[in-house]
Design a protein with these regions (language model features):
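Membrane-proximal lumenal/periplasmic loop motifs of glycosylation machinery
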Residues: 27-36, 49-72, 79, 85-86
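Aromatic-anchored segments of alpha-helical transmembrane domains
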Residues: 20, 122-130, 175-181
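Start-transfer (signal-anchor) and selected internal transmembrane alpha helices
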Residues: 1-23, 167
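Membrane-interface junctions at the ends of membrane-embedded or membrane-associated helices
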Residues: 1-6, 56, 109-110, 156-169, ...
């Protein structure tokens, strides 16, 4: 029972750290960089809320379905009762929290040390330049790609080292998710694996 409480506390702590990173970024950093591309995700979130579907009719694209981006999380914040930039900030923080948690889980399986994996995950989610501020943590247009790429590569490495087929399933799930959203980018990421 004590082990369960210890693990539960650890997972809740990781989630809170991810949420804090998202809130700090969207409240104190990103308002200075918010622009029309970011607002497009907010418009998509409004359409998700109004139509009640993840892929609204007017936003269905052939090569990019944008379902793993920030918009569903903004729509969730809208449902909760937030509006305007507050909905964007809360939704963005929730999205960062989700991707941070997934990233930390995968890295911890690879490293075997939960503290070191938390440090690596935190370093990954600290913006070091304008692209990180805008694309990775602001619009979050590339955040899912980064985490899913980690989710593709590290389990394959673990499979090669330990021959555990469950890690191939995790990698395959990431490929399927990425392919469903962005087929062309997925091809770029998995092309090196095809060569081997």
């Amino acid at each position: 029972m004590m082990e369960f409480k210890k693990n539960y506390f650890w997972h809740v702590s990781v989630i809170i750290i991810g949420l804090v990173i998202g809130l700090v970024h969207h409240i104190y950093i990103y308002p200075n960089f918010f622009h029309a591309d970011s607002a497009a995700y907010q418009v998509l979130a409004s359409a998700i809320r109004d139509e009640g579907v993840l892929l609204p009719h007017d936003f269905f694209y052939g090569n990019q379905l944008i379902m793993l981006k920030i918009s569903p999380f903004i729509a969730l914040a809208n449902y909760i009762g937030f509006s305007g930039y507050k909905a964007y900030a809360i939704g963005g923080a929730i999205a960062i929290c989700v991707w941070f948690y997934i990233c930390n889980l995968i890295i911890s399986k690879y490293c075997g040390n939960k503290y070191f994996s938390l440090l690596l995950s935190t370093c990954l989610f600290i913006p070091l330049g304008m692209d990180d501020i805008d694309f990775l943590l602001g619009q979050e247009s590339h955040l899912s790609n980064v985490v899913l790429s980690i989710m593709i590569c590290l389990p394959v490495i673990i499979y090669i080292q330990e021959s555990k087929k469950s890690f191939l399933c995790i990698s395959a799930l990431a490929v399927i998710l990425m392919t469903a959203e962005q087929p062309i980018r997925t091809l770029i990421i998995i092309a090196p694996f095809i060569l081997f």
